[in-house]
């Protein structure tokens, strides 16, 4: 433990916070090109085939991004917009693709949570 004089001379060193989404370069979103679209299985208590895409961002970073929602039209060479946000049961997947922007279509006929999946407002009768 430092003495009072040592604290006056040097002060305390602030802890550096690690950046969890370094690939985005402090931007809210980044555009990228899909290199591969694949399915992986989640961690232990869960069971599914989760859809992810390997994306090369405009700053040349290669990342894995989760494709949310049921069904998608994404394939190799599709242009997608990527935001931060990890998927808790998929290790190494720290980004989400944004639906309804660029080549990744929104989900048709979705009524609830439409803004998260790029869905159009349903026509009222």
Curated annotation (Swiss-Prot):
Keyword Cell cycle in record: no
Entry GO MF terms: structural constituent of ribosome
Cited CDD domains: Ribosomal_S12
UniProt xrefs under PANTHER family: 30S RIBOSOMAL PROTEIN S12 FAMILY MEMBER
Domain of life: Eukaryota
Principal location class: mitochondrion
Subcellular localization, as worded in the UniProt entry: Mitochondrion
Family in the record: Belongs to the universal ribosomal protein uS12 family.
Protein's UniProt name: Small ribosomal subunit protein uS12m
Coiled coil: none
Keywords (A to Z) from UniProt: Mitochondrion, Ribonucleoprotein, Ribosomal protein
Matches recorded under Pfam families: Ribosom_S12_S23
GO biological process, one term: translation
Gene name as annotated: RPS12
Taxonomic source organism: Allium cepa
Function: Protein S12 is involved in the translation initiation step.
């Amino acid at each position: 433990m430092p003495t009072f004089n040592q604290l006056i001379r040097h002060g305390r060193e602030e802890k550096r916070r690690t950046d969890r989404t370094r690939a985005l370069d402090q931007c809210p979103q980044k555009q990228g090109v899909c290199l591969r679209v694949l399915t992986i299985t989640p961690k232990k208590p869960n069971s599914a085939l989760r859809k992810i895409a390997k994306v090369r961002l405009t700053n040349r970073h290669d990342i894995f991004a989760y494709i949310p929602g049921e069904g998608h039209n994404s394939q190799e060479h599709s242009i997608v917009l990527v935001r931060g946000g990890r998927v808790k049961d998929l290790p190494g997947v720290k980004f989400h693709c944004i639906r309804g922007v660029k080549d990744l279509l929104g989900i048709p006929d979705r009524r609830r949570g439409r803004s998260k999946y790029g869905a159009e407002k349903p026509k009222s009768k």
